[in-house]
């Protein structure tokens, strides 16, 4: 789950990290009231979306007065911001974050991610922060410095000092950086984050380090013990189908193909998409119905897939381990009838009572194409998408 910048900075402030004062508005009428809470005569105006690249897309601007702030809010509120990290439709802008400004002498980059190989958290820092960090990663990887922290012990002061020295910071700035490193380390571990990014972390002419931007992603699997973070979730930033799928504990990710995929198990779902591509097709989605593929969940899965107008065929690939394939077959038939599916449906069943399941499908009056293997299922689905069924 992603947080907005203003939400991330509220967490930063709670952990004693240096941020500038800011406030959020949700309408043009709120701009004057919001700016009255801030000092200074100019502010940074930032569209709040769950995507990077806002600056290059025009979603971040330095506004010189209240009138310019109003104009920025009027331009963006209710619109969609398209960046290199969004799809072609972009993300809806429902909030503008106004923040006090500061002069900048130097920009740094600082982030933390989970390294699954070492089963530890890796902090990454660079002396080249700002909007072009992607180019630094690609063209100058030697400018990236890393330290690994053990989740059992957390970040240690010497690690912060080590990173600070590599960034060319000494004296007071070294201590400030170490304090920021320690605070971010506590935040990352205590809140079960999967990603934390400060870009840029800036050095002001007065010699102070300030977190000018903040990006946080929380591990979805840990949200059950972080009700405070769950309350910050903004479902408007999710694909509408993905949000609907969450209600029924379905894992759905929208793609841009025309073959809808319904599979039980994430690994099998990825394998199914791979083989569809191998046979020349394009998956319209990733959809994992999980181990408990009940009739209700299968019906909801069909409904969600069919909300995508580009879907020309649905491929159902079920391995009956925990669930029996005969029950799945009956569920698929009932779901197809309930939903009123009007596109071809290809079903491949394997595992417990698979033959019985295929027989139930064959004897039904529902127009379902059955496959004996995953290869045959992919071929049938690709041909059906081409209108050759």
From Swiss-Prot:
Its EC number is 6.2.1.5. Binds 1 Mg(2+) ion per subunit. Keywords: ATP-binding, Ligase, Magnesium, Metal-binding, Nucleotide-binding, Tricarboxylic acid cycle. Pfam families: ATP-grasp_2, Ligase_CoA. GO terms for molecular function: ATP binding; magnesium ion binding; succinate-CoA ligase (ADP-forming) activity; succinate-CoA ligase (GDP-forming) activity. InterPro entries: ATP-grasp_succ-CoA_synth-type (IPR013650), ATP_grasp_subdomain_1 (IPR013815), Succ-CoA_synthase_bsu_CS (IPR017866), SUCC_ACL_C (IPR005811), Succ_CoA_ligase-like_bsu (IPR005809), Succinyl-CoA_synth-like (IPR016102). Substrate binds at residues 264, 321-323. It comes from the Bacteria. It catalyses: succinate + ATP + CoA = succinyl-CoA + ADP + phosphate; GTP + succinate + CoA = succinyl-CoA + GDP + phosphate. Belongs to the succinate/malate CoA ligase beta subunit family. Heterotetramer of two alpha and two beta subunits. PANTHER family: SUCCINATE--COA LIGASE [GDP-FORMING] SUBUNIT BETA, MITOCHONDRIAL, SUCCINYL-COA SYNTHETASE BETA CHAIN. Succinyl-CoA synthetase functions in the citric acid cycle (TCA), coupling the hydrolysis of succinyl-CoA to the synthesis of either ATP or GTP and thus represents the only step of substrate-level phosphorylation in the TCA. The beta subunit provides nucleotide specificity of the enzyme and binds the substrate succinate, while the binding sites for coenzyme A and phosphate are found in the alpha subunit. This is Succinate--CoA ligase [ADP-forming] subunit beta. It comes from Haemophilus influenzae (strain ATCC 51907 / DSM 11121 / KW20 / Rd).
């Amino acid at each position: 789950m992603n947080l907005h910048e203003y939400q991330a900075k509220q967490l930063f402030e709670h952990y004693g990290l240096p941020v500038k004062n800011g406030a959020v508005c949700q309408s043009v009428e709120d701009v004057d009231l919001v700016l009255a809470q801030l000092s200074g005569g100019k502010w940074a105006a930032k569209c709040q979306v769950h995507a990077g690249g806002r600056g290059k897309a025009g979603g971040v601007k330095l506004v010189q007065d209240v009138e310019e702030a109003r104009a920025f809010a009027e331009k963006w509120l209710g619109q969609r911001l398209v960046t290199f990290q969004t799809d072609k439709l972009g993300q809806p802008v429902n909030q503008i974050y106004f923040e006090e400004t500061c002069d900048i002498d130097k920009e740094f980059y600082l982030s933390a991610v989970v390294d699954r190989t070492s089963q530890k958290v890796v902090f990454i820092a660079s002396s080249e922060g700002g909007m072009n960090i992607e180019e630094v990663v690609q063209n100058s990887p030697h400018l990236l410095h890393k330290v690994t922290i053990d989740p059992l012990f957390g970040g240690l002061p010497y690690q912060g000092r080590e990173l600070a020295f590599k960034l060319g910071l000494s004296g007071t700035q070294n201590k400030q950086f170490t304090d920021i490193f320690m605070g971010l380390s506590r935040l990352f571990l205590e809140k079960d984050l999967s990603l934390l990014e400060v870009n840029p972390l800036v050095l002001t002419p007065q010699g102070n380090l300030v977190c000018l931007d903040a990006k946080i992603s929380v591990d979805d699997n840990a949200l059950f013990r972080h009700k405070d973070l769950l309350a910050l979730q903004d479902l408007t930033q999710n694909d509408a189908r993905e949000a609907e799928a969450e209600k029924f504990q379905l894992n759905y990710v929208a793609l841009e193909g025309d073959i809808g995929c319904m599979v039980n198990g994430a690994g099998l779902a990825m394998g199914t998409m791979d083989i569809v591509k191998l046979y020349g097709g394009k998956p319209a989605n990733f959809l994992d119905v999980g181990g408990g593929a009940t009739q209700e969940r299968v019906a909801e899965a069909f409904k969600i897939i069919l909300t995508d107008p580009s879907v020309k065929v649905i491929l159902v690939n079920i391995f009956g381990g925990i669930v029996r394939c005969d029950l799945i077959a009956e569920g698929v038939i009932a779901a197809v009838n309930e939903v009123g599916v009007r596109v071809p449906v290809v079903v491949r069943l394997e595992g417990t009572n698979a033959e019985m399941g295929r027989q139930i499908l064959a004897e039904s009056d529902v127009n379902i194409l059955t496959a004996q293997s995953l290869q045959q299922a992919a071929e049938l689905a690709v041909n059906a998408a081409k209108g050759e069924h």
